[in-house]
Amino acid sequence: MYCPRYKHFVRLNTNGTFGVCGHMVNPPQFNNINDAQSWSLSLSDRPAECVRCWELEDIEQPSIRQAAIDRHRILSQIKTDYLIVGGVLDSYCNSACMTCSATLSTKIAKLEGNVFVMDNYEKFQELPHDRIVELDVNGGEPTFSKNYKHLLDNLPANVKVVRINTNGSRYFEKVEELLQRKIKVIVTLSLDGTGNVHDFIRWPIRWVDYTKTVEKYIELRTKYKNLSLDFWTTLNRLNLANFESIKEYAQACAIPHQYGLLKRPAVLDINNTNEEELEQFVEQQMKLRGITWQQ
Protein backbone atom coordinates (compact mmCIF):
# COMPACT_ATOMS: atom_id res chain seq x y z
CA MET A 1 0.00 0.00 0.00
CA TYR A 2 1.75 3.13 -1.22
CA CYS A 3 1.32 6.17 0.99
CA PRO A 4 3.58 9.25 1.16
CA ARG A 5 2.11 10.27 4.49
CA TYR A 6 4.31 8.22 6.82
CA LYS A 7 7.49 9.86 5.47
CA HIS A 8 6.13 13.38 5.34
CA PHE A 9 3.79 13.56 8.33
CA VAL A 10 4.82 13.71 11.97
CA ARG A 11 2.28 13.47 14.75
CA LEU A 12 2.62 14.91 18.25
CA ASN A 13 1.16 12.21 20.49
CA THR A 14 -0.64 12.71 23.78
CA ASN A 15 2.13 10.92 25.70
CA GLY A 16 4.89 13.20 24.43
CA THR A 17 6.16 10.83 21.73
CA PHE A 18 6.27 11.29 17.96
CA GLY A 19 4.13 9.28 15.57
CA VAL A 20 3.71 8.93 11.83
CA CYS A 21 0.61 9.42 9.68
CA GLY A 22 -1.77 10.36 12.50
CA HIS A 23 -4.59 8.23 11.08
CA MET A 24 -3.31 4.74 11.91
CA VAL A 25 -4.72 2.20 14.34
CA ASN A 26 -2.16 1.07 16.96
CA PRO A 27 0.56 3.21 15.36
CA PRO A 28 4.26 3.00 16.25
CA GLN A 29 5.55 5.65 18.66
CA PHE A 30 9.03 7.18 18.86
CA ASN A 31 10.91 9.25 21.41
CA ASN A 32 12.64 11.42 18.81
CA ILE A 33 11.92 12.75 15.36
CA ASN A 34 14.82 10.92 13.67
CA ASP A 35 13.51 7.50 14.68
CA ALA A 36 10.04 8.43 13.49
CA GLN A 37 11.35 9.48 10.08
CA SER A 38 13.42 6.28 9.74
CA TRP A 39 10.45 3.94 10.21
CA SER A 40 9.20 2.04 7.15
CA LEU A 41 5.65 0.96 6.33
CA SER A 42 4.94 -2.73 5.82
CA LEU A 43 5.10 -3.89 2.21
CA SER A 44 1.76 -5.64 2.71
CA ASP A 45 -1.11 -4.53 0.48
CA ARG A 46 -3.10 -4.00 3.66
CA PRO A 47 -0.91 -3.06 6.62
CA ALA A 48 -2.82 -3.61 9.87
CA GLU A 49 -2.11 -0.04 10.98
CA CYS A 50 -3.85 1.32 7.88
CA VAL A 51 -7.21 -0.39 8.38
CA ARG A 52 -9.13 2.89 8.56
CA CYS A 53 -8.03 3.80 5.03
CA TRP A 54 -8.46 0.49 3.28
CA GLU A 55 -11.88 -0.09 4.88
CA LEU A 56 -13.06 3.17 3.32
CA GLU A 57 -11.46 2.36 -0.02
CA ASP A 58 -13.20 -1.04 -0.01
CA ILE A 59 -16.56 0.75 -0.06
CA GLU A 60 -15.29 3.26 -2.63
CA GLN A 61 -15.13 6.16 -0.18
CA PRO A 62 -12.21 8.64 -0.24
CA SER A 63 -9.49 7.88 2.29
CA ILE A 64 -6.79 9.89 4.04
CA ARG A 65 -4.21 7.91 2.02
CA GLN A 66 -5.72 8.96 -1.29
CA ALA A 67 -5.90 12.58 -0.17
CA ALA A 68 -2.25 12.37 0.91
CA ILE A 69 -1.20 11.21 -2.55
CA ASP A 70 -2.94 14.20 -4.12
CA ARG A 71 -1.38 16.57 -1.57
CA HIS A 72 2.07 15.04 -2.14
CA ARG A 73 2.04 16.13 -5.78
CA ILE A 74 1.58 19.73 -4.65
CA LEU A 75 3.70 19.92 -1.51
CA SER A 76 6.71 18.11 -2.98
CA GLN A 77 7.02 20.98 -5.46
CA ILE A 78 7.39 23.42 -2.56
CA LYS A 79 10.00 21.35 -0.74
CA THR A 80 11.07 17.80 -1.61
CA ASP A 81 11.62 16.83 2.03
CA TYR A 82 8.51 18.69 3.19
CA LEU A 83 6.99 17.93 6.54
CA ILE A 84 3.40 18.16 7.71
CA VAL A 85 3.07 18.39 11.47
CA GLY A 86 -0.11 17.10 13.02
CA GLY A 87 -1.41 15.61 16.20
CA VAL A 88 -2.08 17.19 19.54
CA LEU A 89 -0.53 20.48 20.61
CA ASP A 90 -2.33 20.44 23.95
CA SER A 91 -5.54 19.24 25.58
CA TYR A 92 -7.12 22.60 26.42
CA CYS A 93 -10.74 22.21 25.37
CA ASN A 94 -14.17 23.68 26.05
CA SER A 95 -16.04 20.51 25.10
CA ALA A 96 -16.62 17.12 26.72
CA CYS A 97 -17.47 15.07 23.65
CA MET A 98 -18.89 11.58 24.17
CA THR A 99 -16.20 10.11 21.92
CA CYS A 100 -13.31 11.84 23.70
CA SER A 101 -11.33 11.38 26.92
CA ALA A 102 -9.52 13.30 29.66
CA THR A 103 -6.22 12.98 27.77
CA LEU A 104 -7.59 15.17 24.96
CA SER A 105 -9.98 17.43 26.84
CA THR A 106 -9.38 19.47 29.97
CA LYS A 107 -13.17 19.78 30.17
CA ILE A 108 -13.52 16.02 30.66
CA ALA A 109 -10.52 15.94 32.98
CA LYS A 110 -12.16 18.58 35.17
CA LEU A 111 -15.45 16.64 35.26
CA GLU A 112 -13.53 13.58 36.41
CA GLY A 113 -11.78 15.59 39.12
CA ASN A 114 -8.49 15.32 37.26
CA VAL A 115 -5.99 18.19 36.92
CA PHE A 116 -4.25 16.54 33.94
CA VAL A 117 -3.19 18.88 31.11
CA MET A 118 -1.31 17.54 28.11
CA ASP A 119 1.04 20.13 26.59
CA ASN A 120 3.28 19.40 23.59
CA TYR A 121 4.36 22.96 22.85
CA GLU A 122 8.01 22.34 23.80
CA LYS A 123 7.96 19.05 21.88
CA PHE A 124 6.98 21.00 18.78
CA GLN A 125 10.18 23.04 19.16
CA GLU A 126 12.25 19.84 18.62
CA LEU A 127 11.02 19.50 15.05
CA PRO A 128 13.05 20.67 12.00
CA HIS A 129 11.15 23.93 11.45
CA ASP A 130 12.78 24.60 8.07
CA ARG A 131 11.05 21.49 6.65
CA ILE A 132 7.57 22.32 7.91
CA VAL A 133 5.32 23.52 5.08
CA GLU A 134 1.96 22.54 6.54
CA LEU A 135 0.68 22.76 10.09
CA ASP A 136 -2.09 20.39 11.08
CA VAL A 137 -1.79 20.27 14.87
CA ASN A 138 -4.91 20.52 16.94
CA GLY A 139 -6.13 19.85 20.46
CA GLY A 140 -8.08 19.93 22.44
CA GLU A 141 -9.79 22.87 20.79
CA PRO A 142 -7.52 25.34 18.92
CA THR A 143 -9.82 28.31 19.53
CA PHE A 144 -9.57 27.63 23.27
CA SER A 145 -5.77 27.23 23.45
CA LYS A 146 -3.28 30.04 24.17
CA ASN A 147 -0.52 27.74 22.89
CA TYR A 148 -2.21 27.42 19.52
CA LYS A 149 -2.70 31.16 19.16
CA HIS A 150 0.97 31.74 20.05
CA LEU A 151 1.99 29.12 17.50
CA LEU A 152 0.01 30.83 14.73
CA ASP A 153 1.62 34.15 15.62
CA ASN A 154 5.09 32.56 15.30
CA LEU A 155 4.80 30.18 12.36
CA PRO A 156 7.95 28.60 10.89
CA ALA A 157 9.05 30.57 7.83
CA ASN A 158 8.22 27.90 5.22
CA VAL A 159 4.67 27.20 6.36
CA LYS A 160 2.31 27.67 3.43
CA VAL A 161 -0.74 25.77 4.69
CA VAL A 162 -2.49 25.70 8.05
CA ARG A 163 -5.31 23.29 8.74
CA ILE A 164 -7.44 24.00 11.79
CA ASN A 165 -9.67 21.26 13.16
CA THR A 166 -12.33 22.86 15.32
CA ASN A 167 -15.48 21.83 17.15
CA GLY A 168 -17.23 24.90 15.75
CA SER A 169 -18.12 26.31 19.14
CA ARG A 170 -16.70 29.70 18.26
CA TYR A 171 -15.38 31.67 15.31
CA PHE A 172 -11.57 31.89 15.23
CA GLU A 173 -10.38 35.43 14.44
CA LYS A 174 -6.85 34.14 13.76
CA VAL A 175 -8.11 32.58 10.52
CA GLU A 176 -8.55 35.93 8.78
CA GLU A 177 -5.12 37.09 9.98
CA LEU A 178 -3.56 34.05 8.30
CA LEU A 179 -5.55 34.62 5.13
CA GLN A 180 -4.34 38.20 4.95
CA ARG A 181 -0.78 36.86 5.13
CA LYS A 182 -1.52 34.80 1.98
CA ILE A 183 -1.35 31.51 3.86
CA LYS A 184 -3.65 28.75 2.66
CA VAL A 185 -6.09 27.93 5.47
CA ILE A 186 -8.23 24.81 5.69
CA VAL A 187 -10.85 24.91 8.42
CA THR A 188 -12.16 21.45 9.21
CA LEU A 189 -15.34 21.57 11.25
CA SER A 190 -16.18 18.43 13.20
CA LEU A 191 -19.75 17.49 12.31
CA ASP A 192 -20.81 14.58 14.51
CA GLY A 193 -24.53 15.19 14.48
CA THR A 194 -27.31 17.67 13.83
CA GLY A 195 -29.77 19.12 16.32
CA ASN A 196 -30.11 17.16 19.56
CA VAL A 197 -27.68 14.49 18.39
CA HIS A 198 -24.99 17.14 18.03
CA ASP A 199 -25.82 18.63 21.42
CA PHE A 200 -25.55 15.22 23.09
CA ILE A 201 -22.33 14.05 21.44
CA ARG A 202 -20.62 17.45 21.53
CA TRP A 203 -21.84 18.62 24.94
CA PRO A 204 -21.90 21.44 26.01
CA ILE A 205 -21.53 22.91 22.49
CA ARG A 206 -24.97 23.88 21.18
CA TRP A 207 -26.13 23.20 17.64
CA VAL A 208 -27.52 26.72 17.35
CA ASP A 209 -24.07 28.17 18.11
CA TYR A 210 -22.33 25.67 15.83
CA THR A 211 -24.48 26.66 12.84
CA LYS A 212 -23.78 30.35 13.47
CA THR A 213 -20.05 29.61 13.42
CA VAL A 214 -20.41 27.72 10.14
CA GLU A 215 -22.29 30.67 8.63
CA LYS A 216 -19.44 33.03 9.59
CA TYR A 217 -16.87 30.81 7.90
CA ILE A 218 -19.02 30.52 4.78
CA GLU A 219 -19.19 34.32 4.64
CA LEU A 220 -15.41 34.55 5.10
CA ARG A 221 -14.93 32.07 2.25
CA THR A 222 -16.57 34.54 -0.13
CA LYS A 223 -13.84 37.08 0.68
CA TYR A 224 -10.73 34.89 0.47
CA LYS A 225 -9.85 32.39 -2.23
CA ASN A 226 -7.17 30.89 0.02
CA LEU A 227 -9.75 29.64 2.52
CA SER A 228 -11.16 26.12 2.22
CA LEU A 229 -13.81 24.60 4.44
CA ASP A 230 -14.69 20.98 5.03
CA PHE A 231 -16.71 18.86 7.41
CA TRP A 232 -15.42 15.73 9.15
CA THR A 233 -17.69 13.18 10.80
CA THR A 234 -16.45 10.49 13.17
CA LEU A 235 -19.12 7.88 12.51
CA ASN A 236 -20.11 5.84 15.56
CA ARG A 237 -23.09 4.15 17.20
CA LEU A 238 -24.35 7.43 18.66
CA ASN A 239 -24.70 9.24 15.33
CA LEU A 240 -25.20 6.43 12.81
CA ALA A 241 -28.99 6.95 12.69
CA ASN A 242 -28.38 10.68 12.19
CA PHE A 243 -25.94 10.23 9.31
CA GLU A 244 -28.37 11.11 6.52
CA SER A 245 -29.23 14.37 8.29
CA ILE A 246 -25.52 15.11 8.68
CA LYS A 247 -24.94 14.62 4.95
CA GLU A 248 -27.96 16.77 4.07
CA TYR A 249 -26.67 19.62 6.23
CA ALA A 250 -23.21 19.44 4.65
CA GLN A 251 -24.75 19.49 1.18
CA ALA A 252 -26.95 22.47 2.07
CA CYS A 253 -23.85 24.37 3.23
CA ALA A 254 -21.97 23.48 0.01
CA ILE A 255 -19.06 22.30 2.13
CA PRO A 256 -17.17 19.08 1.25
CA HIS A 257 -17.83 16.29 3.72
CA GLN A 258 -15.76 13.26 4.68
CA TYR A 259 -16.06 10.73 7.44
CA GLY A 260 -14.12 8.04 9.25
CA LEU A 261 -15.18 5.06 11.35
CA LEU A 262 -14.58 5.32 15.08
CA LYS A 263 -12.54 2.47 16.56
CA ARG A 264 -12.07 3.72 20.13
CA PRO A 265 -13.75 3.51 22.52
CA ALA A 266 -14.68 0.08 21.15
CA VAL A 267 -18.18 0.30 22.62
CA LEU A 268 -18.99 3.02 20.05
CA ASP A 269 -17.63 1.12 17.03
CA ILE A 270 -20.55 0.69 14.58
CA ASN A 271 -19.61 -3.00 14.26
CA ASN A 272 -20.14 -3.54 17.99
CA THR A 273 -23.64 -4.96 18.57
CA ASN A 274 -23.54 -5.20 22.38
CA GLU A 275 -26.55 -3.08 23.35
CA GLU A 276 -26.14 -3.60 27.10
CA GLU A 277 -22.56 -2.35 26.98
CA LEU A 278 -23.63 0.70 24.97
CA GLU A 279 -26.44 1.49 27.40
CA GLN A 280 -24.06 1.30 30.35
CA PHE A 281 -21.56 3.55 28.58
CA VAL A 282 -24.18 6.17 27.74
CA GLU A 283 -25.58 6.15 31.28
CA GLN A 284 -22.09 6.61 32.71
CA GLN A 285 -21.31 9.51 30.38
CA MET A 286 -24.64 11.23 31.06
CA LYS A 287 -24.10 10.94 34.81
CA LEU A 288 -20.62 12.45 34.50
CA ARG A 289 -22.00 15.42 32.56
CA GLY A 290 -25.31 15.73 34.38
CA ILE A 291 -27.36 15.52 31.18
CA THR A 292 -30.12 13.43 29.61
CA TRP A 293 -30.45 11.90 26.15
CA GLN A 294 -32.97 13.66 23.92
CA GLN A 295 -32.67 12.14 20.46
Question: What is each stretch, according to the model?
Answer:
Residues E49, E57, Y92-A96, S101-L104:
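Short pre-active-site segment immediately N-terminal to redox-active cysteine/selenocysteine motifs
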Residues L127-R131, T213-L229, C253, L288-T292:
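A structural motif corresponding to the C-terminal end of an alpha-helix
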Residues L152, V175-E176, T211-I218, F243-E248:
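Generic structural signal for well-ordered alpha-helices
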Residues D81-Y92, T103-D119, D130-S145, A157-F172, ...:
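Core AdoMet radical
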Residues R52, E60-L83, C93-S95, N114-V117:
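Recognition helices and adjacent regulatory flanks at domain boundaries
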Residues M1-I69, K263-Q295:
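Accessory C-terminal segments flanking Radical SAM cores
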Residues E177-K184, I218-T222, Q251:
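Acidic (Asp/Glu)-rich catalytic clusters
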